[in-house]
Amino acid sequence: MKVLNLKERWSSKARSYDDLFILAVLGALCGLLSGLLMAFFYAVIYLPSRYWIGEDFDSFESLPVEWRVGLVLAGSVVLAIIFSLLPSRLHKVGVPYVVERLNYHNGNLPIWNAVVQFFSAAIGLISGLSIGKEGPAVHLGATLGGYLAEKAKLPQYGVETLLACGVAGAISAVFQTPLAGVLFAFEVIFLEYRQQYVLPVLLSSVIATLISHNLIGPLDVFSIESISSVSLSLDLFYACFALVAFIVFLSALFLHTQKSLWRLSGLSIWARFLFVALVTSVLAIYLPEVLGSGYLSLSRLLSGDLIVYSLFLLIIVKTVLTAFTIGLGIPGGMIGPTFIIGGLAGIQVALIFDNNEADMVLFALLGMAAMMAACFQAPLTALVAIIEMTHSSSVIVPALFVVVLACLLMRVFFHQESVFVERLSYMGMSSTVSPFQRYLRHHTVKPVAEDVLLLPQYVPIEQVKDLASSMIDYVVFKIGNEHHLVRRVAILDALSKLDQGPQLWLAAEGDSVKMDFSLALESTFVPVIDEPSSLEQMLGWFQKHGLPEVLVTVTASSFSLVSRNRLDQFLLKSDQ
């Protein structure tokens, strides 16, 4: 018995190592494809922009007024036409949709929604709307991971792993921060850290970063060479307190503006999108720096090439406009713009405290980290992103300070979760699954499945006698197109009646005498289904159909028997 237990444990470990290797290979493939897809997405967005803007593709303020207004109006009208023609099921895009599909549809992300996300986000970004590319990148990466998992027929934990690989790969390719990409997948999408997913997700993230770096080039938002060391003085922390207060104000403004606009989702697409076009067009005339993602404005402010008459006004308007644009349903991201808003806020605080150029860069980084952490409740992602961007740990203490304070204040005083969690909550959905659901999702049907023998309806008597030495308890045979289940013991009991004389179920075929199972036995019809990806799907099937047993297809010619009773016993045992 001990030998059998050791063998069982060893084979279980071997299977887990095989699963890890398969997931690592698929994760690497997911990272490769995510990197290529993000490079293509980048080209689709920025090549047309460079045609009419020039090398500085995010510099919409350099365009004539009529061009700025024309681009905004044209982009909004094209988006309104597209979304008014598409069925409503294809309108769902972005990070909240990814979390919804993960929690309510086992991570199954339709391809066509990703296609809509790709082109609609590209149109919005090219036209200068105040949105980002990072949210759409998450949707595209997650869809790619889910597609690979579906084609590989992975169980549910494998689907979730590749989903995380796709998200991490996409974020890593966009920001070129591989570790921050991994943490983003766990903190923002899964809302928990999952140790068993780490290796494949890390591999995907690193490969996507390498692909992005080689195809796009370095994506340095601004020069950080001036940061060599940080003096942890009291003046620094006074300034950090001021920065946190400003960031929390901006985060609350950003979130509450969106919340107030979610109530307008009942308006027509034309009304909402043209409203965005009108407001953005007016701002494009008087404050063109608010157009686009804002990366170039931040970079120019730090280098001294751009001077705005009121940086504070720019920050407030950019915050409200981004929330306004996203809140009314424009299919873009909010991660990039909030990152830039935080950077601008950091520069504003640095100017108030009359800091030098090096401190301006430092506070821009701190503002970016604090804003990301406060809006998306992703403290580790924000912290690690800053460390990876600076290639230095010298900023870690002030970054920790502002990130933790910003997150705490948003949670404790404003009672606000991540903007994505708040969006799902507004829609009446949960952003997490219960521990019981998670347990079911992380197990396949193998622990509750029993082997069965698949035999024809007519079986030679000699073969029936051989069943006495079999260790399998159940036999399945077909009557027409239906599968019927019978216990092996019942077959042997029927066979023993031959000692009493000829039986009605005997059938002669040439020189062979066979048993007709349909006449000899009282069998139970049992349906056949494809193997579910998790015990959650299996339990859902039993609850829906109310049947006690089902055959699960293992291969084209073999089945396993799963019973509701055995499933309940497994769940009760797991609670002990």
Regions found by a protein language model. Name each.
Residues 504-517:
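Acidic/proline- and glycine-rich, intrinsically disordered low-complexity segments
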Residues 509, 519, 523-576:
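Cytosolic regulatory modules rich in charged/polar residues
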Residues 1-442, 446-475, 480-481, 487-507, ...:
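Alpha-helical transmembrane segments and immediately membrane-proximal extracytoplasmic
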Residues 445-447, 517-522:
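Short, conserved catalytic or adaptor-binding loops enriched in Gly and charged residues
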Residues 483-490, 558-564:
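Amphipathic coiled-coil signal-relay and dimerization helices
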